[in-house]
From Swiss-Prot:
Residue sites binding L-tryptophan per the record: 79-80, 88, 190, 256
Pathway(s) served: Alkaloid biosynthesis; ergot alkaloid biosynthesis
Pfam families associated with the record: Trp_DMAT (PF11991)
Subunit structure: Homodimer.
Gene: dmaW
Name of the protein in its database record: Tryptophan dimethylallyltransferase
Keywords: Alkaloid metabolism, Transferase
Organism name: Claviceps fusiformis
Binding site for substrate: 99, 186, 188, 269, 271, 273, 355, 357, 421, 425
Lineage: Eukaryota, Fungi, Dikarya, Ascomycota, Pezizomycotina
């Protein structure tokens, strides 16, 4: 009887074959690739696709991850994770789609040649365009011009010493959605530095850029106008005053970032991400229905599932803020972050589509895993209910899984065309049998099983 190959078999084989030009790239490979390989296997990718996607990761992505983070090393601080690590894996559990997101950097990032990391992404995309047909740069070029620092603004900020102390210096990041042997590329843009340089809020920069684009691409106007109306109602001073009188902190919705698909604009989605500081089921319900503007049967069916997921995850309610600084590598989190939502604007659709993000970072990973397994089983996704914990524990085999609280960052949920979508966003650093070699730096060792016997 044939036995199934281990989930990391492709990683093990490639590790025997690959050479690396430097120690930094070798560390990135062995830190991320075990979990990446296991996720591809969990999502049902065949072995040929696994080799292709891991090969692309090694050849075209790792060179743009920069200095490998370790205690005492200076690295570019990425907003992508609370630890400043510029890479994150995510898994759409119900559609079996693997995604990875990263902030490209080069040796010029943070120097006079590219003080605020505006150009590394262009070099990275040029590499990816050569191996994947269908990548379209029109909307990326437009939003980059609207939301990323230009040369004049960069020079102005360079004379402001306080900018280097900003918690957000990320301006852009890329994501690859892996489908079969292909990938779809999308870009995320953070206008925080542009806001400092221009004096215009990130929120207004994002909404103004989409408003201007909608004058040319009128097919996105209907859904964008609905979103503007909802956000304006949430940000109305009279509404906030009423909340304050009731003893509830005012919770305006503020845009944090924007993303778009790098495909033909007629098929691309624009996504506007907003922070919700009031963490509660009532707030999530309001985000889901756009304050009662979405009332169709599909929305209401999704609302029931979203409520169920909220109760299973047991997220504490309250008014949350982002901390001023990143966590140190290996630091065990003791914090709760705001919720988030993105609204997708599709051409020729009357309503924006919501995807809500349950921010579970800092909560028990075992508890989240059990909640997700229950949710999967209740709705007939028995295979994922069986596989998910096995995959996650196997990605951190030397840790006391019951003690961990930093593996899950978000659980996202959406409901489109009468179908639910649930994704998990995961800590993707020092995975597998880390350290791969005895002299590799180890930051996340607080709950390594080998340490427990010493306490």
């Amino acid at each position: 009887m044939m036995t199934k190959a281990p989930a990391t078999a492709v990683y093990d084989t490639l590790s025997l074959l690959f050479d690396f030009p430097n120690q930094e790239q070798r560390l990135w490979w062995h830190s991320i690739a075990p979990m990446f390989a296991a996720m591809l296997d969990t999502a049902g990718h065949n072995v040929h696709d696994q080799y292709r996607h891991l090969g692309i990761f090694k050849k075209h992505i790792i060179p743009f991850l920069g200095v490998y983070p370790a205690q005492g090393k200076h690295t570019w601080p990425s907003v992508l994770t609370r630890y400043g690590i510029p890479f994150e894996l995510s898994l759409n559990c119900l559609d079996s789609v693997v995604r990875y997101t990263f902030e490209p950097t080069t040796e010029h990032t943070g120097t006079g040649d590219d003080s605020y990391n505006a150009f590394a992404i262009l070099e990275c995309i040029q590499k990816l365009v050569r191996i994947q047909p269908g990548i379209d740069m029109e909307w990326f070029s437009y939003f980059r011009n609207e939301l990323v620092l230009n040369a004049t603004e960069s020079a102005r900020l360079g004379r402001n010493d306080s900018v280097n102390q900003q918690p957000i210096r990320t301006q852009n990041k890329l994501a690859l959605d892996l489908k079969g042997d292909r990938f779809a590329l999308k870009v995320y843009l953070y206008p925080h530095l542009k806001s400092i340089a221009t004096g215009v809020s990130s929120h207004d920069l994002i909404f103004n850029s989409v408003r201007k684009l909608s004058q040319k691409h009128t097919s996105i106007q209907p859904s964008f106008n609905v979103l503007c109306d909802y956000v304006a109602s949430r940000n109305d001073p009279d509404s906030n005053a009423a909340e304050a009188e009731a003893g509830v902190p005012a919770s305006a919705l503020r845009a944090r970032l924007l993303s778009c698909d790098l495909v033909d604009p007629s098929k691309s989605r624009i996504k506007i991400y907003l922070l919700e500081q009031t963490v509660s089921l009532t707030a999530m319900e309001d985000l889901w229905t756009l304050g009662g503007r979405r009332t169709d049967s599909s929305t209401l069916n999704g609302l029931d599932m979203m409520r169920e997921l909220w109760h299973l995850l047991q997220i504490p309610s309250g008014f949350m803020k982002y901390p001023e600084s990143d966590l140190k590598l290996g630091e065990v989190p003791d914090e709760q972050l705001p919720s988030m939502v993105h609204y997708a604007l599709h051409p020729d659709q009357p309503m924006p589509e919501p995807q809500v993000y349950f921010t579970v970072f800092g909560m028990s990973d075992a508890g989240i895993t059990n909640a997700l397994a229950t949710f999967f089983s209740r709705h007939g996704w028995y295979e994922m209910a069986k596989k998910y914990r096995v995959f996650l524990e196997g990605s951190f085999p030397n840790h006391d899984f019951e003690s961990l609280n930093y593996l899950h960052t978000y659980v996202s949920f959406s409901y489109r065309k009468n179908k639910p979508y649930l994704s998990v966003y995961l800590h993707s650093f020092e995975t597998g049998q880390w350290p791969a070699f005895s002299d590799d730096p180890t930051a996340f060792n607080a709950f390594k099983r080998c340490d427990l016997s010493l306490t």
